[in-house]
UniProtKB/Swiss-Prot annotation:
It catalyses: GTP + H2O = GDP + phosphate + H(+). Residues 68-84 are annotated as: Switch-II. The keyword Nucleus applies. It comes from Gallus gallus (Chicken). Its main location: nucleus. One of its GO terms (cellular component) is midbody. It comes from the Eukaryota. The record marks Q69 as: Essential for GTP hydrolysis. Residues 7-171 form the Small GTPase Ran-type domain. This is GTP-binding nuclear protein Ran. Keywords: Cytoplasm, GTP-binding, Hydrolase, Magnesium, Metal-binding, Nucleotide-binding, Nucleus, Protein transport, Transport. The lineage of its organism: Eukaryota, Metazoa, Chordata, Craniata, Vertebrata. It is an enzyme of class 3 (hydrolase). PANTHER family: GTP-BINDING NUCLEAR PROTEIN RAN, RAN GTPASE.
């Protein structure tokens, strides 16, 4: 039995991507999750319980954050085992972090075959964007969802979680009925830039994929 008020529906979410892409910054935006996080010493990870209130009741994502281990090579299988969903993050101001996305995806699906995965391009608030919408095609080849995000401004924070919740519950009409308490924005996402990026993504989605066989 879940404790009183404890969400019955829980999912293990693994957050992966190169070091420095903003994974920890992203997960720390959710204030109650940050307050209630637990450290798993055996694996060297922090687990943040992020609760979202939906029209079908509360859902909890137990988000596993690597605490920077990925800087020392790959992650151990124990990190991935029993994951029910994942977010792969790269930094839109760093091309190499996008180039490494296929490696993270490969490690993930080797252990967790058919889980829903969201690809997130973080730091879109920074004007000097290197990885443009038209170059982001990996998700289309692998049937993942993609979102531009800006962790420091809270831009699109809830989008990956809403998409994953709909997939995991099997209800495309699932909605968040209240936003979780988020840390105040450290930067402001320019609304004109956000609108431009959304338009760029829509155009990119309808563009034919390049023919080359490489993963990117």
């Amino acid at each position: 039995m879940a404790a009183q008020g404890e969400p019955q529906v829980q999912f293990k979410l693994v957050l992966v991507g190169d070091g420095g892409t903003g994974k920890t910054t992203f997960v720390k935006r959710h204030l109650t999750g940050e307050f209630e996080k637990k450290y798993v010493a055996t694996l060297g990870v922090e687990v943040h319980p992020l609760v979202f209130h939906t029209n079908r009741g509360p859902i909890k994502f137990n988000v596993w954050d690597t605490a920077g281990q990925e800087k020392f090579g790959g992650l151990r299988d124990g990190y991935y085992i029993q994951a029910q969903c994942a977010i792969i993050m790269f930094d839109v101001t760093s091309r190499v972090t996008y180039k490494n996305v296929p490696n993270w995806h490969r490690d993930l699906v080797r252990v967790c075959e058919n889980i829903p995965i969201v690809l997130c391009g973080n730091k879109v608030d920074i004007k000097d964007r290197k990885v443009k919408a038209k170059s982001i095609v990996f998700h289309r080849k692998k049937n993942l969802q993609y979102y531009d995000i800006s962790a420091k401004s809270n831009y699109n924070f809830e989008k990956p979680f809403l998409w994953l919740a709909r997939k995991l519950i099997g209800d495309p009409n699932l909605e968040f009925v209240a936003m979780p308490a988020l840390a105040p924005p450290e930067v402001v996402m320019d609304p004109a830039l956000a609108a431009q990026y959304e338009q760029d993504l829509q155009i990119a989605q309808t563009t034919a994929l390049p023919d080359e066989d490489d993963d990117l």
